[in-house]
Swiss-Prot record:
It catalyses: 4 porphobilinogen + H2O = hydroxymethylbilane + 4 NH4(+). It is an enzyme of class 2 (transferase). Its cofactor is dipyrromethane. It comes from the Bacteria. Belongs to the HMBS family. The gene is hemC. Tetrapolymerization of the monopyrrole PBG into the hydroxymethylbilane pre-uroporphyrinogen in several discrete steps. Its EC number is 2.5.1.61. It comes from Vibrio vulnificus (strain YJ016). The porphobilinogen subunits are added to the dipyrromethane group. GO terms for molecular function: hydroxymethylbilane synthase activity. The lineage of its organism: Bacteria, Pseudomonadati, Pseudomonadota, Gammaproteobacteria, Vibrionales. Keywords: Porphyrin biosynthesis, Transferase. This is Porphobilinogen deaminase. InterPro entries: HemC, Porphobilin_deaminase_cofac_BS, Porphobilin_deaminase_N, Porphobilinogen_deaminase_C, Porphobilinogen_deaminase_C_sf. The modification S-(dipyrrolylmethanemethyl)cysteine is found at residue 243.
Length: 312
């Protein structure tokens, strides 16, 4: 079967973004032999503003806006995202249509000196740009000093190697995809640090009325991952979670059931509201909403209100 018009994938230029774009390109060409796929690379605001915490300059949506404009203007057909960077709302005419199989969703502890969080001496400096990681780390080890860490994976590792940090926390999936797994000293299990919503999964956004693209993307959707991520995202949407708030969540499938764990906390870890829920997989999104409301009733509402007021 021949496909005359090439598919254009909008992507950022960072090594991890390019890995994800090539991953989708390869999957499309494997599913549809003869299909031409081109990459349209672009720089986003999130790539340019590196001296300010994400939460203060508009959150993770900074990494996707330019890609979305390219699709709406017809310069690209689809965009590939790391699911943990995808905002809960989409511009009119665009939507998240495909979620690919999830990589390792855990956080990774990276250090040149220490093997584990428990080995860090009192007052050690740990780098992360995630309020979620900061919150859980400070709750576990209040003595640690958390220092802002921005830039792509290579930049962050360079800063560690330059001695600016005793350790840094990164997503395990990104290190594995960039073949940097040897830098991981230990994995941080969900029991100690719940991942970000959708962490480790790759999502594909496109125009919701583009029948050709929707059809081509169908074989790339991974139903198990999609149900888990939809459950986590439904919870996040109900909490109105953004980059400014420490929210962790992790959904697991157990047969026909889905098990969702989640938390909302103060950035300094002084207060964390946790909860979990189990129910039929077919009700994944309803369960996410249910758990979010439970967390809100148990104290998360006050935490979130305060945090959003602080950022106004």
């Amino acid at each position: 079967m021949t496909h005359s018009t090439p598919i254009r994938i909008a992507t950022r230029k960072s090594p991890l973004a390019l890995w994800q774009a090539y991953y989708v390109k390869d999957a499309l060409q494997k599913a549809h032999p003869g299909l031409e796929v081109e990459l349209v690379t672009m720089v986003t605001k999130g790539d340019v503003i590196l001296d300010t915490p994400l939460a203060k300059v508009g959150g993770k949506g900074l990494f996707v806006k330019e890609l979305e404009v390219a699709m709406l203007e017809g310069r690209a057909d689809l965009a590939v995202h790391s699911m943990k960077d995808v905002p809960v709302d989409f511009p009119e005419g665009l939507g998240l249509v495909t979620i690919c199989e999830r990589e390792d969703p855990r956080d990774a502890f990276v250090s040149n000196t220490y093997h584990h969080v428990d080995e860090l001496p009192q007052g050690a400096v740990v780098g992360t740009c995630s309020l979620r990681r900061q919150c859980q780390l400070k709750a576990y080890r209040p003595d640690l000093v958390i220092k802002e860490l921005r830039g792509n994976v290579g930049t962050r590792l360079s800063k560690l190697d330059a001695g600016e940090y005793d350790a840094i926390i990164l997503a395990a999936a990104g290190l594995k995809r960039l073949e940097l797994e040897e830098r991981i000293r230990s994995f941080i299990e969900p029991e100690q640090s719940l991942p970000a919503v959708g962490q480790g999964a790759v999502g594909i956004e496109c125009r919701t009325n583009d029948e050709r693209i929707l059809k081509l993307l169908e074989p790339l959707n991974h139903a198990d991952t999609a149900d888990r991520v939809k459950c986590e995202r439904a919870m996040n949407l109900t909490l109105e979670g953004g980059c400014q708030v420490p929210i962790g969540s992790y959904a697991l499938l157990e047969g026909d059931e889905i098990w969702l764990r989640a938390l909302v906390g103060e950035p300094d870890g002084s207060e964390i509201v946790r909860g979990e829920i189990r129910g039929p997989r077919a009700q994944a999104e309803q369960l996410g909403v249910q758990l979010a409301n439970q967390l809100l009733d148990e104290g998360a509402r006050e935490i979130l209100t305060k945090l959003y007021q602080d950022h106004e």
